[in-house]
């Protein structure tokens, strides 16, 4: 009951801090660092060089990160956090989803990220 709610709130805050760290690294072009901080399952699903290419392309198209607003969050089993943001980049504003997980004894890590460039979860707005 109450203990779970407290735990959920705590892990949600940690995940939100991780997203902010990710955006900061993105703006600095430190894509490898984002990759290194991700979960093993993320690394198993995505080769490092592919991730670096995708992030470089994202920077070219979307531009630098400007701001974000949390639209929705969900905590599953007090260890998995889904965060949906409306994210403003220089060129576009769109919805992005981040999934963080805390495995036993491990720090929280990025399990998945999804950029909704097709506008399934919210309008893609061209800013420039």
Question: Where are the predicted features?
Answer:
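Structural motif
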Residues: 26, 57-60, 105
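Short solvent-exposed beta->alpha transition segments
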Residues: 16-17, 32-82
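Short, low-complexity N-terminal intrinsically disordered segments enriched in polar/charged residues
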Residues: 1-28
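Exposed beta-sheet edge and beta->alpha loop/turn motif
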Residues: 72-128
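Acidic-enriched, low-complexity/disordered segments with a strong bias for Aspartate over Glutamate
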Residues: 8, 20, 36, 40, ...
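Short charge-dense sequence patches
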Residues: 1-9, 45-50, 96
